[in-house]
Structure formats: structure tokens, C-alpha cells
Amino acid sequence: MESPPESMAERKRRLVAGELRDAALMLLATKGFDAVTVDDIAAVAGVSRRTFFRYFASKEDVVVRFLADMGASVVTELAARPRAEPPSAALRHAIWVPLAACTDRADHTERARIVVRLILDTPALHARWLDRQSRWRDALAAELAARHRLDPDTDPYPRMAAGMAMLALDTVLRQWQPGADEQRLAELTDQAFAVVAPALDTPGASQP
């Protein structure tokens, strides 16, 4: 069934939210998290402070939405992979999609890298990052359990595999250096999954 067409109000709301997100990420990337205020973000986006708070609860919330979009795509991509595909390949693809989206333009790549560093290095943002990772891990574990017909309450594989996938993502992000392009990110992703692939590709091995 096709989704209903987007209304004018929905389109406007999506566009304004996107402008606020882009303004926030640009400022955070160039000035640092603590130096940016909500007023700064609203001014760059060309809206009022009140309008900002119609879309986001705080500047932290802008980054959390950025993370939420990344996590949602990971789970969606895994669910779309062929059931016969090795788990390491399916999870590698699922993790790679949001990473590749960060490198769709040269200017976007460096901005995304800096924002990722802010997330990892700013305690308030890193706490949100860990919370989001926990949610993604649960969602990935549920999908892996369904794919391999395992009970996540009795078989450790789904949660362990989901945790390894999240660890691979975290490792790639931490190794993302200035000037790294899409090819370099792909190499880092391959290296991370090469480490965990032997364990990922043995679903059910924990069963007696």
C-alpha cells in the first residue's frame, strides 16, 4: 500500500526541521558544542527562538535526531537483506548505509566527521549516543533472532551479534580521521567486520 501524499503543512514542517538541523550541525562543527546557543541556531536558520522549540527540545535534541535517523536506517537495512546472506555481510551492509550517507558530498563528509567527534568527545552527547546504541542493539537483536529463528531470552547469539555490530560501528567512527573519503570509510568498515565475522557467522553455535 502506498503512503498518502505529503501535505503542504507536513512538507513545510519537514523543510524547516531540516534547515534547523543543518544550521545546528554546521555551527556545532565549526564552533564546538558549548559555544553554540539555540539563538545562534535559530538565527542561522532564519527563524525565531520560539520556532526552534516547536521542532527541538534543545540543541542536544538536534544531535539525538541525527543519531536516531542513523539507527533507524541500520535496522531497516538489516531487515531488507536476504535471509540466506551470512550475518556478517548483512550486518556490514546495514552499518555501512548510514556511514555512506555521511559522505555523499565532500563538504558534508567533513562536517559529519566533526559532529561525530563532538558526539564522542562531549559527555552530554556521548551519554545520548550510548543510550541510542542500546536501543539499536535491542532492535538489531530482535531482527537477528527472527532471521535465525532463535530465542533471544535463551540464546546469547542475537544480543552478542548485535553488540559486535555496534562495536564495529563505534570503532569505525573513532578511527574516522580528517580527509578520509568514502573509500577510506569503507576500508575501515571492512577491517572492523573482518575481526568479528567469524563469530557473527556462527548463529546457533551456542546451542547444545
Language-model-detected regions and their locations in the chain:
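HTH DNA-binding helix-turn interface
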Residues: S7, K31-F33, F53-V63
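Append "Primarily bacterial transcriptional regulators
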Residues: D40-A43, F52, L91
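Amphipathic alpha-helical segments enriched in hydrophobic/aromatic and basic residues
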Residues: L28, T37-V38, K59-M70, L91, ...
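Basic, helix-initiating cap at the start of DNA-binding domains
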Residues: M1-K31, A35-V47
